[in-house]
Structure formats: structure tokens, C-alpha cells
């Protein structure tokens, strides 16, 4: 099987809402501190906590074909391990994302297969990067404005990548002012072209630092280049737990 086909399994949104003209927010120090804090909080509702495990069902539609896969996913900080559960032909395969590097691991292979930056822009690999985006950690706030999405008051962030390790150079990100969760994101390549659009739903809740907060239940990812391509990620069985660093040890995973 070609590696680009395998990428459709990678884990780590469907109608755009009404967008109204944005109102500029002054970029003074107090406003910037508020914007940064809100961005950090929005990340907590998508998995950027001390340790988390979940199951994800993925349905991907591309070129008239539909693929369905289920994965068990472990996440801690910027590290993520996806273990294929179904269909049976891919069960046991693994994908490791560590410090923005990515590897594919298959039973029977003596060495992991590294996924190049170019390959990360293809197929499901780009969707995996969208699912695991660390907005507060990997991006700088160039500007933020008052806006609305689906009639909900938001801040619209214009984010710029801090370095070239991340897949997307720029992101436009709508964050709910009241609920402190990301609702929509547009992802741009280095050339300035919009590549993907993501929509987020939050029907789960988790406890973070003793406080209940909404947690992502579904992501719908649309391809701006190929209008018919669509990926839906549904999250289940979410558990906050301690995850050992050894879970992301590449040498141990290929044994």
C-alpha cells in the first residue's frame, strides 16, 4: 500500500456560519494578554492537557470513495500516538507524532518510516496536523478582531507560525468569547493559499484543574483545493490520565 494511502488513517470541520464584518481590537498589552489566555484555554478543549486517551472514528471521503477507520490515541503535550483498531487489515499499525516529527510503524517492519514535511501536506496527514494544532504554542498572534460565527460572539485571530516546523504558515481562528472554545479555523500554506477549513463541535465535558469544561466531540475538515474531499473525526471514551514518556519512545514502538 502506498504511504499516501496510509495517511488517510492519521488522527491527529458542515456548513460555514454567518460571518459579519470584524471590529478591530486595540493591540495594547492588556488586550494581548487576554487574547493569549483565551487561546491557551481553547487549546485545553481539544486535548492539550497533561495526558489524555481517546478513541476516534474517522470517515474520509475522497475522489468518490469513503474510508472508515477507528483508532486509539494517546496524547501528552505535543506528542501523540495513534494505534489502529479497525478495519482488521490495519489493526496494530501505529503513527507517532513527536515534536512535530511523524513516523509510520507497521508490524513486521524493522524500522519506522519517517513522514516528510511534503508528505504531511498530503491526504490524512494534513488532517492529523489540524487535529493536533497547538494554536497558543506554535503560533504568534498577528492581530485579533471582534467577529461572529453562527451568530455567536467570537474573537477572530490571525496567527503566524513561529517556525517552519509546523505544517501551516498561517491560520485564521474563530474562538467563542463566552465558551472559550475554537469554532472554526482556516489553514494557509506558505504561498498564501487556503488549504483546509476546520469546524469544531463540543458535546463532551472533561475536568481540567478541577473545573468542568467543554471538550471536542467532532471535527469536520474540508479541503479548499478539492471541494469534494471531506473528513469527519468523532471522539469517544475520553480519559484524562497519566501517560508515561515511554509511550512515545520510537525504539520501543518498533519492537
Predicted features along the sequence, with ranges:
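Short, surface-exposed charged micro-motifs
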Residues: 70-72, 93-94, 172-174, 199
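Sec/Tat signal peptide C-region and signal peptidase I cleavage site
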Residues: 15-22
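Hydrophobic residues embedded in beta-strands of well-ordered beta-sheets
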Residues: 79-80, 102, 112, 182
Amino acid at each position: 500500500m502506498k504511504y499516501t494511502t496510509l495517511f488517510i488513517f492519521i488522527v491527529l470541520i458542515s456548513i460555514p456560519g454567518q460571518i459579519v464584518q470584524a471590529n478591530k481590537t486595540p493591540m495594547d498589552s492588556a488586550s494581548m494578554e487576554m487574547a493569549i489566555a483565551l487561546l491557551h484555554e481553547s487549546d485545553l478543549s481539544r486535548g492539550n492537557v497533561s495526558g489524555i486517551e481517546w478513541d476516534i472514528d474517522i470517515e474520509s471521503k475522497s475522489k468518490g470513495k469513503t474510508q472508515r477507520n477507528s483508532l486509539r490515541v494517546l496524547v501528552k503535550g505535543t506528542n501523540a500516538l495513534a494505534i489502529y483498531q479497525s478495519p482488521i487489515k490495519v489493526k496494530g499499525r501505529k503513527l507517532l507524532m513527536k515534536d512535530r516529527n511523524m513516523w509510520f510503524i507497521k508490524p513486521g517492519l524493522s524500522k519506522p518510516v519517517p513522514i516528510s514535511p511534503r508528505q504531511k501536506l498530503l491526504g490524512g496527514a494534513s488532517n492529523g496536523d489540524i487535529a493536533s494544532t497547538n494554536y497558543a504554542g506554535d503560533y504568534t498572534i498577528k492581530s485579533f478582531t471582534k467577529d461572529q460565527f453562527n451568530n455567536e460572539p467570537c474573537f477572530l485571530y490571525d496567527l503566524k507560525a513561529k517556525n517552519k516546523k509546523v505544517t501551516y504558515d498561517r491560520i485564521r481562528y474563530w474562538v467563542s468569547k463566552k465558551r472559550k472554545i475554537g469554532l472554526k479555523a482556516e489553514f494557509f500554506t506558505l504561498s498564501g493559499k487556503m488549504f483546509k477549513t476546520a469546524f469544531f463541535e463540543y458535546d463532551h465535558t472533561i475536568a481540567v484543574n478541577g473545573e468542568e469544561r467543554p471538550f471536542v466531540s467532532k471535527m469536520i475538515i474540508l479541503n479548499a483545493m478539492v471541494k469534494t474531499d471531506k473528513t469527519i473525526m468523532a471522539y469517544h471514551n475520553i480519559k484524562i490520565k497519566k501517560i508515561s514518556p515511554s509511550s512515545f519512545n520510537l525504539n520501543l514502538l518498533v519492537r
